[in-house]
């Protein structure tokens, strides 16, 4: 908790519109993180959802209930044809039938961070650390960057899948990570709320 408070204090500001970004999908984890950051830690989060190709009615209902309870929320729908193409190639090349969406829940969120000048991004838990996986970040390291995302979560297939998709830059906008220069200027910090519990 001490480490979390130190991180939050660095980003908490009455002068900024948003202190951090949280990712929400209509499930319990993102809602829990966003609620705690706003109410327990007095942060002003911008909740972001990346729409998948298929949505469940329950997930949509839960997300609407969450937003209606008093949160600023941005719902992004990346080009759905591009999503289908990336999902198909991701399935054949990487074994992930939802690979396009997996890319977008990282790349689109980071694009929002750059566009809104919000350097702190929270995901709920780190499946790689919680359930076993790529341990390069290390169990004692809470904050990470794009290299960890493209390695651990996208299993080093990100560039290959985007190239094989043969899609236009416009179609790929929400699927491409911001440039290294943009991220360096922002001083991006990505973390998981679960790391601090």
State each model region's role:
Residues 32-33:
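Hydrophobic positions on the alpha1 helix immediately C-terminal to the Walker A/P-loop
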Residues 1-19, 36-197:
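Nucleotide-activated chemistry modules centered on ATP-dependent adenylation/adenylyltransferase
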Residues 21-29:
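Short, glycine-rich nucleotide/cofactor-binding loops
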């Amino acid at each position: 908790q001490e480490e979390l408070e130190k991180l939050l204090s660095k980003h908490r500001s009455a002068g900024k519109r948003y202190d951090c970004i949280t990712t929400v999908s209509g499930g319990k984890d993102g809602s829990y993180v966003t609620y705690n950051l706003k109410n327990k830690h007095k942060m002003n989060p911008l909740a972001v959802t990346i729409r998948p190709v298929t949505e469940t009615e329950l997930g949509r209902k839960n997300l609407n209930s969450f937003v209606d309870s008093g949160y600023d929320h941005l719902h992004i729908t990346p080009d759905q044809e591009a999503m289908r193409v990336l999902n198909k190639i991701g399935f054949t090349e990487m074994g992930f039938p939802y690979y396009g969406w997996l890319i977008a829940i990282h790349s689109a969120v980071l694009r929002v961070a750059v566009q809104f000048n919000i350097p702190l991004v929270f995901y709920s838990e780190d499946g790689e650390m919680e359930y076993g996986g790529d341990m390069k970040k290390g169990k004692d390291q809470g904050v990470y960057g794009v290299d960890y995302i493209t390695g651990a979560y996208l299993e080093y297939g990100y560039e290959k899948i985007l190239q094989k998709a043969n899609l236009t830059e416009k179609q790929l906008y929400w699927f491409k990570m911001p440039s290294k220069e943009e991220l360096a200027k922002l001083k991006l910090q990505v973390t998981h709320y679960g790391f601090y519990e």
